[in-house]
Amino acid sequence: VNLFKVNYRMHDKYLIVDEKMYLLGGRNSNDIFLGDQTKGINEDRDILVYDTSEGQGESLNQLEDYFHKIWKESCVSIKKGKQSSRYTDVYRHMEEIYISLLKRYNDIETYSAWEKDTIEANKITLINNGIEAGRKTPQVLQTIQYLTENADHVIIQTPYVICNGYMYDVLQGISDHAKLQIVLNAVEKGSNPWGCTDYLNQKKKILETGADVYELMNDYPVHTKAVLINDRLSVVGSYNLDMRSTYLDTELMLVID
């Protein structure tokens, strides 16, 4: 048993529907993110991409290819279990939830204005951090560094910041030629106590890169991961500005022009 593999996680989050559209961001599939929004709430950001070319969209194809590569990884095992009364009860409970949602949002099954309610993009590109269950090359951070080379203004939103020397060098390099702003949770407001508390140790080093740091005192923790480059590029997905996202976990980000 390779115990080191326990440390590597699949951290990307996406939903593909009928080769027509997909939803991608940082939102987990539990009650904090998808529940009734009455307790334990986290605020997040997702991107809905609607493909008008009937399955020929570049980013949609990239995402489907990525899924199949993950599915075929040697570390992936198919779980087969016998149907039990427990599963039947859960299924019935989910049906009841769906019926209640139909009452609140009666256009769930009939809504069709996807093209009208979305904004056309010049180009959407999927970037990832590698799929192997092992230490990864920091592909997402390197791509962000490349995209910001000629930028005048860069805004990074992340739940928290935990960097090593290389990552600080990247931030320093950005702030040398651009106005760099980092938006994160205040320590007392974040939902990840380990990540947010370490900010107290990291704060001086972050400020020494030349970045302006804004600590959010929202009613609810913010789980958003995004980079805005000038007034043109948005980079949104699952990548936190920390060493786990940079070197260990699978991550996906959309670059939207």
Where are these regions (language model features)?
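Charged, low-complexity intrinsically disordered terminal segments
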Residues: V1-K13, V17-D257
